Amino acid sequence: MQIRQWNKILIPYEQAVEELKVKFKGIRTELREINEYSPIEFVTGRVKTVSSILEKAKKYNVPDDQIEEKIEDIAGIRIMCQFVDDIYSVIELIRQRDEKDLKVLYEKDYLHNEKESGYRSYHVIIEYPVQTAYGQKKILAEIQIRTLAMNFWATIEHSLHYKYKENIPERIRERLKKAAEAAHRLDEEMWEIRDEVINAQKLFEVKSNTVSSIVNNIQLLNLIGRKGEAREFQEKFEALWEKGNVGDLKELLHTIKYVVARFQAFD
């Protein structure tokens, strides 16, 4: 295929990656906005380069005219989680969308069936409809769900595969396996303190959202000409901020909102 043809072929894949990133990031944002724990830590995505596609097609003897049907990861989404349990929560979120805005074709469980190299992850192969300028096009995409520790290890391993053209020296392979085991132990240790970590993060989110709302409402008082009240609340806020008590900050926010609503009603 000519380069010009490839550029045209890959456009729907680029669109799919951007749409899927927005959707999964949206889940994370929505949960955090309502102070709920999000199993999604962050999301990335990419479309394979033409050279990578051709290399994979050559490796698996895929004819040019079957590349889009046989190579499932031209479009790739990677979802990172803090804990192993979160991976299964994300998988369930994807399954719930089956036959809605995407179709789950099959899954690959490398958590319970890790690769010989030590690779761990969970892959979901989907069919995703893209609305193009020429009508709807259904494409294949791979969603990889893994922990931060798994992702760190996989990124290093991928770089070494690229450097050694998949012929990684045995001594490095052995060290990689040991590193994979260490990453697995780290995930297990983090799971043991999961509740404490989540509670701390929730508290941070609540405090952050409360402070942001207080500042916005004080600014609003200034905008509607209530500078004296704004200055008074600013001083109270600074005093409470030093103490760091979330309950006191919430109470202050409630009072400020009441005052703002009262003054706006008179305007």
PLM region spans:
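An acidic, glycine-/histidine-flanked metal-binding catalytic module
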Residues: 1-31, 141-267
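A short, surface-exposed helix-loop junction/capping segment
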Residues: 1-4, 35, 67-76
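Amphipathic alpha-helical interface elements
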Residues: 4, 11, 71, 80-85
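Generic alpha-helical secondary structure
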Residues: 9, 13, 17, 50, ...
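Solvent-exposed loop and beta-edge segments used for protein-protein assembly and interaction
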Residues: 16, 71-73, 118
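Surface-exposed, low-hydrophobicity interaction/linker segments
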Residues: 16-61
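Extended, charge-rich alpha-helical segments
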Residues: 54-55, 64-70
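Long beta-strand-rich cores associated with HINT superfamily self-processing modules
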Residues: 68, 80-192
